[in-house]
A protein has these predicted regions:
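Short, hinge-like loop/turn segments at secondary-structure boundaries
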Residues: 13-18, 43-44, 101-102, 133-136
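N-terminal phosphate/diphosphate-binding loop that engages ATP/GTP or pyrophosphate donors
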Residues: 1-37, 42
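Switch II (G3) loop of P-loop NTPases
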Residues: 27-32, 51-67
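Active-site flanking residues adjacent to catalytic metal/cofactor-binding acidic residues
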Residues: 1, 56, 86
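Short, small-residue-enriched loops and turns at beta-alpha junctions
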Residues: 3-8, 31-35, 60-63, 91-93, ...
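Conserved catalytic-core segment of NTP-binding enzymes
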Residues: 62-165, 178
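Active-site regions of enzymes building and remodeling cell-envelope glycoconjugates
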Residues: 21, 163-178, 184
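Glycine-rich phosphate-binding loop signature in dinucleotide/nucleotide-binding domains
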Residues: 47-54, 78
Protein backbone atom coordinates (compact mmCIF):
# COMPACT_ATOMS: atom_id res chain seq x y z
CA UNK A 1 0.00 0.00 0.00
CA UNK A 2 1.24 3.47 -0.86
CA UNK A 3 0.30 6.26 1.53
CA UNK A 4 1.27 9.36 -0.44
CA UNK A 5 4.60 10.94 0.44
CA UNK A 6 6.10 13.86 -1.48
CA UNK A 7 9.67 12.46 -1.34
CA UNK A 8 9.07 8.84 -2.21
CA UNK A 9 5.88 7.48 -3.69
CA UNK A 10 5.81 3.81 -4.53
CA UNK A 11 3.12 4.59 -7.11
CA UNK A 12 5.81 6.39 -9.15
CA UNK A 13 7.44 2.97 -9.55
CA UNK A 14 4.36 0.84 -10.19
CA UNK A 15 5.83 -0.67 -13.39
CA UNK A 16 9.02 -1.71 -11.59
CA UNK A 17 7.07 -3.13 -8.65
CA UNK A 18 4.82 -5.12 -10.99
CA UNK A 19 7.90 -6.50 -12.77
CA UNK A 20 9.21 -7.62 -9.36
CA UNK A 21 5.92 -9.36 -8.57
CA UNK A 22 4.59 -6.74 -6.17
CA UNK A 23 0.93 -5.76 -6.34
CA UNK A 24 0.60 -2.07 -5.52
CA UNK A 25 -2.50 -0.62 -3.91
CA UNK A 26 -2.45 3.17 -4.00
CA UNK A 27 -4.91 6.07 -3.91
CA UNK A 28 -6.18 7.30 -7.29
CA UNK A 29 -4.33 10.62 -6.84
CA UNK A 30 -1.07 8.98 -5.73
CA UNK A 31 0.86 10.28 -8.76
CA UNK A 32 -0.18 13.88 -8.12
CA UNK A 33 1.21 16.51 -5.78
CA UNK A 34 -1.58 15.94 -3.24
CA UNK A 35 -0.27 14.69 0.10
CA UNK A 36 -3.45 13.33 1.64
CA UNK A 37 -3.38 10.08 3.62
CA UNK A 38 -6.51 8.49 2.16
CA UNK A 39 -6.91 4.76 1.66
CA UNK A 40 -8.40 3.36 -1.55
CA UNK A 41 -11.28 0.87 -1.17
CA UNK A 42 -9.06 -1.88 -2.67
CA UNK A 43 -7.01 -1.86 0.53
CA UNK A 44 -9.57 -4.11 2.20
CA UNK A 45 -8.64 -6.89 -0.23
CA UNK A 46 -5.40 -7.47 1.70
CA UNK A 47 -7.37 -9.10 4.49
CA UNK A 48 -8.60 -11.81 2.10
CA UNK A 49 -5.18 -12.71 0.70
CA UNK A 50 -3.86 -16.09 1.79
CA UNK A 51 -0.15 -16.87 2.03
CA UNK A 52 0.80 -13.30 1.12
CA UNK A 53 3.29 -10.98 2.74
CA UNK A 54 1.65 -7.57 3.08
CA UNK A 55 3.80 -4.47 3.53
CA UNK A 56 2.27 -1.12 4.41
CA UNK A 57 4.63 1.84 4.37
CA UNK A 58 2.81 4.53 6.30
CA UNK A 59 5.76 6.91 6.36
CA UNK A 60 7.71 8.07 9.37
CA UNK A 61 5.17 10.27 11.08
CA UNK A 62 1.63 10.45 12.42
CA UNK A 63 0.15 11.71 9.13
CA UNK A 64 0.62 8.42 7.28
CA UNK A 65 -0.13 6.49 10.46
CA UNK A 66 -3.54 8.19 10.67
CA UNK A 67 -4.52 6.47 7.43
CA UNK A 68 -3.23 3.19 8.83
CA UNK A 69 -5.40 3.74 11.90
CA UNK A 70 -8.50 3.29 9.75
CA UNK A 71 -7.51 -0.38 9.42
CA UNK A 72 -6.34 -1.08 12.96
CA UNK A 73 -9.13 -3.50 13.89
CA UNK A 74 -8.62 -5.60 10.77
CA UNK A 75 -4.84 -5.50 11.19
CA UNK A 76 -5.07 -6.60 14.83
CA UNK A 77 -7.42 -9.45 13.90
CA UNK A 78 -5.13 -10.61 11.08
CA UNK A 79 -1.98 -10.34 13.23
CA UNK A 80 0.89 -8.05 12.38
CA UNK A 81 4.44 -6.91 12.89
CA UNK A 82 4.85 -3.15 13.01
CA UNK A 83 8.44 -2.14 12.48
CA UNK A 84 9.54 1.31 13.59
CA UNK A 85 12.32 2.29 11.19
CA UNK A 86 14.86 4.75 12.57
CA UNK A 87 17.55 6.77 10.83
CA UNK A 88 20.15 8.54 12.96
CA UNK A 89 20.74 10.94 10.09
CA UNK A 90 17.10 12.00 9.72
CA UNK A 91 16.52 15.61 10.79
CA UNK A 92 13.67 14.83 13.20
CA UNK A 93 15.53 12.10 15.07
CA UNK A 94 19.26 12.75 15.38
CA UNK A 95 19.28 11.70 19.05
CA UNK A 96 17.88 8.42 20.44
CA UNK A 97 15.69 10.41 22.84
CA UNK A 98 13.89 11.97 19.87
CA UNK A 99 12.72 8.60 18.55
CA UNK A 100 10.33 7.78 21.40
CA UNK A 101 7.99 10.79 21.00
CA UNK A 102 7.81 10.13 17.23
CA UNK A 103 7.00 6.49 17.87
CA UNK A 104 4.27 7.39 20.37
CA UNK A 105 2.71 9.80 17.84
CA UNK A 106 2.71 7.04 15.21
CA UNK A 107 1.25 4.49 17.63
CA UNK A 108 -1.45 6.90 18.78
CA UNK A 109 -2.44 7.83 15.23
CA UNK A 110 -2.40 4.23 13.98
CA UNK A 111 -4.02 2.67 17.09
CA UNK A 112 -1.33 -0.01 16.78
CA UNK A 113 1.81 -0.81 18.77
CA UNK A 114 5.24 -1.20 17.24
CA UNK A 115 6.76 -4.64 17.72
CA UNK A 116 10.43 -3.97 16.86
CA UNK A 117 12.90 -1.39 15.59
CA UNK A 118 14.87 -1.52 12.33
CA UNK A 119 17.95 0.65 12.01
CA UNK A 120 17.94 2.12 8.50
CA UNK A 121 20.48 4.87 9.20
CA UNK A 122 21.85 6.05 5.88
CA UNK A 123 23.07 9.02 3.90
CA UNK A 124 21.68 7.85 0.56
CA UNK A 125 24.50 7.24 -1.95
CA UNK A 126 27.10 8.58 0.49
CA UNK A 127 26.44 5.65 2.84
CA UNK A 128 29.29 3.28 3.52
CA UNK A 129 29.60 0.47 6.07
CA UNK A 130 31.07 2.85 8.64
CA UNK A 131 28.02 5.13 8.29
CA UNK A 132 25.82 2.23 9.38
CA UNK A 133 28.20 0.98 12.09
CA UNK A 134 28.39 4.48 13.59
CA UNK A 135 24.59 4.47 13.93
CA UNK A 136 24.28 1.13 15.75
CA UNK A 137 24.74 2.62 19.27
CA UNK A 138 22.03 5.17 18.37
CA UNK A 139 19.67 2.38 17.27
CA UNK A 140 20.38 0.24 20.34
CA UNK A 141 19.69 3.18 22.65
CA UNK A 142 16.50 4.06 20.72
CA UNK A 143 15.33 0.45 21.05
CA UNK A 144 16.07 0.52 24.78
CA UNK A 145 14.17 3.80 25.27
CA UNK A 146 11.22 2.51 23.23
CA UNK A 147 11.25 -0.85 25.07
CA UNK A 148 11.46 -2.71 21.77
CA UNK A 149 13.94 -5.19 20.33
CA UNK A 150 16.35 -4.02 17.63
CA UNK A 151 15.48 -6.46 14.84
CA UNK A 152 18.39 -5.61 12.53
CA UNK A 153 20.36 -2.85 10.83
CA UNK A 154 20.16 -2.36 7.07
CA UNK A 155 23.17 -1.85 4.83
CA UNK A 156 22.82 -0.73 1.20
CA UNK A 157 24.16 -3.52 -1.00
CA UNK A 158 26.70 -1.15 -2.57
CA UNK A 159 28.20 -0.53 0.90
CA UNK A 160 28.64 -4.20 1.83
CA UNK A 161 32.37 -4.89 2.02
CA UNK A 162 32.50 -8.50 3.22
CA UNK A 163 30.16 -10.93 4.89
CA UNK A 164 27.78 -8.95 7.08
CA UNK A 165 27.94 -9.55 10.81
CA UNK A 166 24.93 -10.96 12.64
CA UNK A 167 22.17 -8.38 13.05
CA UNK A 168 22.73 -6.75 9.64
CA UNK A 169 20.81 -7.19 6.39
CA UNK A 170 21.77 -5.97 2.93
CA UNK A 171 19.10 -4.04 1.05
CA UNK A 172 18.96 -3.30 -2.65
CA UNK A 173 18.04 0.21 -3.68
CA UNK A 174 15.86 0.21 -6.79
CA UNK A 175 15.06 3.89 -7.20
CA UNK A 176 16.97 7.15 -7.40
CA UNK A 177 16.06 10.69 -6.56
CA UNK A 178 15.72 12.93 -9.62
CA UNK A 179 18.80 14.93 -8.65
CA UNK A 180 21.07 11.88 -8.50
CA UNK A 181 23.36 10.95 -11.33
CA UNK A 182 22.43 7.67 -13.05
CA UNK A 183 25.96 6.36 -12.42
CA UNK A 184 25.71 6.66 -8.65
Amino acid sequence: MDVVNPYFRSSDYSALLKKLGVELIAPVFANTTLDTPVLPPEIFSIFNMENADIFIDAGGDDVGATALGQLHRQIETAGYEMLYVVNRYRVLSTKPEETLPLLREIETASHLKATAIVNNSNLAVQTDMQTVLNAVPFAKKAAELCHLPLLYSTVPDFAVENTLPEGFKAVKRYVRFVWEDETE
